[in-house]
C-alpha cells in the first residue's frame, strides 16, 4: 500500500520513462519516481535495477533514499524471494 500511495502523487509511468530517456543528466529523483511506478506496475526487477544504479552512483543521495526504498521492496517481496535475495546481494556488494 505504501508504494501505491506514493505512486498516486507521481506522473504516469510512460511520462516518467520518457522524461528519463530525454534527460541528459542522471536525474536521481526522476529515477526514484519511475522505480516507484514500476513497482506498482508489477515491474519490480526494473525498479530494483534503477534504484541500484542510484546507489552505485551516489549512495548518500537524499539520506540513502534509494537504498532505503530497495529495502522496502525487499520487505514487500518477503523473505526467501529469489529476486529480493539477488538484489540484496548486489546492493551489499556495492556498499561493502
Model-derived features: where do they sit?
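Non-globular targeting/processing and membrane-anchoring segments
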Residues: 1-96
Amino acid at each position: 500500500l505504501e508504494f501505491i500511495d506514493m505512486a498516486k502523487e507521481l506522473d504516469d509511468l510512460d511520462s516518467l520513462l520518457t522524461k528519463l530517456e530525454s534527460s541528459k543528466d542522471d536525474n536521481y529523483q526522476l529515477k526514484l519516481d519511475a522505480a516507484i511506478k514500476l513497482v506498482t506496475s508489477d515491474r519490480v526487477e526494473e525498479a530494483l535495477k534503477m534504484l541500484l544504479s542510484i546507489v552505485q552512483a551516489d549512495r548518500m543521495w537524499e539520506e540513502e533514499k534509494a537504498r532505503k526504498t530497495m529495502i522496502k521492496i525487499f520487505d514487500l517481496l518477503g523473505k526467501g524471494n529469489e529476486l529480493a535475495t539477488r538484489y540484496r546481494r548486489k546492493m551489499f556488494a556495492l556498499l561493502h
